């Protein structure tokens, strides 16, 4: 396993190597040593000329790959420039399924962070457990869901909550460059932590 994330929390907490899943050793399934999945799933699509194609369609709006890339790049700048994100830091994402949730996820990955998405129904107690176990210090949160997260913050090491949905996060994004150089993660670096309820 290569090491590129400066905050090694995720690698340090993996199960023993003998419990890792078995992977195929077919050459066509090999990944390069350095791979940021945001480049593969977003940047490469735009570079190949598909930037104006829709990536997310909601009842209110249709979002293109180019728009998602721009917003993700600006979010990555907010994380690095304003929040002091260190590659490997976990970032809690609290929102319903939405365009902005996807943009935040890609922004976290571009910056070398690890996205920890939550369900909107989680209360302060469940959020607090996640924040503690994953040692989360930064959160992006839909302003409509802020109350439970703010309650969870009181007894945690969560330092920063940036709200979106007509709030401060969009203001911070608006002054950031539209380009971002993705953090050069290794192909085996963790990019998400998914807590489950056991269902």
Locate predicted features.
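Flexible, non-catalytic linker and terminal segments flanking ANL/adenylate-forming cores
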Residues: 1-36
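AMP-dependent adenylate-forming
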Residues: 39-67
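Adenylate-forming
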Residues: 42, 68, 72, 91, ...
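Phosphate-coordination loops involved in phosphoryl transfer and adenosine-cofactor binding
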Residues: 53, 87-89, 187
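Conserved AMP-binding/adenylate-forming
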Residues: 61-63, 78-122
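Conserved AMP-binding A3 loop
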Residues: 64-67, 191-199
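Conserved ATP-dependent adenylate/AMP-binding module captured primarily in the ANL superfamily
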Residues: 89, 122-152, 175
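Conserved pre-ATP/AMP-binding loop-to-beta segment of ANL
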Residues: 176-195
């Amino acid at each position: 396993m290569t090491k590129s994330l400066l905050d090694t929390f995720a690698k340090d907490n993996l199960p023993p190597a003998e419990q890792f899943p078995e992977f195929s050793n077919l050459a066509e399934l090999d990944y390069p040593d350095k791979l940021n999945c945001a480049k593969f799933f977003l940047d490469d699509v735009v570079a190949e000329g598909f930037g104006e194609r829709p990536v997310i369609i909601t009842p209110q709006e249709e979002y293109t790959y180019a728009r998602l890339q721009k917003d993700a790049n600006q979010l990555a700048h907010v994380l690095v420039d304003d929040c002091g994100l260190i590659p490997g830091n976990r970032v809690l994402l609290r929102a319903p399924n939405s365009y902005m949730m996807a943009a935040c996820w890609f922004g976290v990955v571009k910056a070398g962070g690890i996205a920890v998405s939550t369900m909107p129904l989680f209360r302060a107690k469940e959020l607090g457990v996640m924040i503690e176990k994953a040692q989360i210090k930064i959160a992006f949160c839909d302003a409509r869901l802020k109350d439970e997260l703010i309650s969870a913050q009181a007894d945690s090491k969560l330092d920063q909550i940036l709200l979106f949905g007509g709030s401060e996060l969009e203001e911070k994004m608006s002054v950031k460059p539209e380009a971002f150089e993705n953090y050069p993660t290794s192909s085996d670096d963790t990019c998400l932590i998914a807590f489950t309820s056991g269902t």
